[in-house]
A protein has these predicted regions:
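Terminal-region recognition feature
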Residues: 1-179, 183-192, 196-216, 221-281
Length: 281
């Protein structure tokens, strides 16, 4: 009887450890799956367009080893217009916080490899949450924009998500620095949020901002324009005045963002950084 009791006790002690190990293994597996975003084929397609993936962009922009991702395991919700049943961990945006030149920043990076970076209600919730955290901590928020616009399969829910983001933009205005980096299409509703932020960076030949694309312009007016002519970096830097900075490559663009962060105060209660160097007038 004593031996039986000891055996039962030993097995019962082992069960929680096994369950814990199983959960840890599942967590590691899901983390690897989340890092693949839309899958290897979509990542390859992104590279063929001359663009980096959302995670590659974060690695270049943020100080090494400082990025902490939030809401990594949120998935896209099924709807009646999508019968594929595909689930993407993290949805079409990566959110989190980290350091740039040892200064805390919050950011979101739209992931074009997941359903074209389209905005769903879940994506909007993630973006709004990271903007709230930036406000609570008094730190800049940076948006890496690469999106085809609203996820039309979700109808008004997607559009409602945009309105929530716009509200966050207006409430953060004058309180914390807001920076938008246009690294792909910013079409339709995706255009308004960057326009509400303090600084807009655009990369030539890959970043565009417009309400409607060239196809719609042609159908309505008969005019033929390219994506770059309609909403490229040169157009917004020299004609509309929407863009404040332009760059020839993503790497150059991120260097410019990092440089700007050096000069900005963290929030409206902070003082701008002081230069120790003295220049001869």
């Amino acid at each position: 009887m004593k031996l039986l009791f000891q055996t039962i006790l030993r097995i019962s002690n082992q069960l929680p450890k096994r369950k814990t190990q199983q959960k840890i293994s599942l967590l590691k597996q899901k983390s690897i799956e989340a890092k693949l975003s839309g899958g290897e084929a979509k990542i390859k397609s992104q590279h063929e367009r001359g663009k980096l993936t959302a995670r590659e962009r974060i690695e270049i922009l943020i100080d090494p080893g400082t990025f902490e991702e939030t809401d990594r395991f949120i998935v896209n919700q099924p709807n009646e217009f999508d019968d594929s049943g595909e689930k993407f961990l993290g949805e079409a945006v990566i959110t989190g916080y980290g350091k740039i030149n040892n200064k805390t920043v919050f950011l979101y990076a739209q992931d074009f490899t997941v359903l074209g970076g389209s905005l769903s209600q879940a994506v909007a919730n993630k973006i709004c949450k990271i903007m709230d955290l930036a406000m609570q901590n008094g730190a800049p928020v940076i948006g890496l924009i690469d999106s085809g616009g609203a996820r039309i399969q979700e109808g008004v829910n997607s559009l409602a998500g945009y309105s929530s983001i716009f509200l966050k933009n207006t409430r953060a205005s004058g309180v914390i620095p807001q920076i938008s980096v246009i690294l792909g299409p910013a079409a339709g509703g995706a255009t308004y949020s960057p326009a509400l932020t303090d600084f807009i960076f655009m990369v030539s030949n890959i970043g565009q901002m417009y309400i409607t694309g060239p196809e719609v312009i042609k159908a309505v007016t008969g005019e033929k324009v390219s994506h770059e002519e309609l909403g490229g970096a040169d157009t917004h830097a020299s004609k509309s005045g929407v863009a404040h900075f332009t760059a020839e490559s993503e790497a150059d663009c991120f260097n410019q963002v990092r440089k700007l962060i050096e000069f900005l105060p963290q929030n409206n209660l902070d003082e701008p950084s002081q230069e120790n160097e003295h220049f001869d007038p």
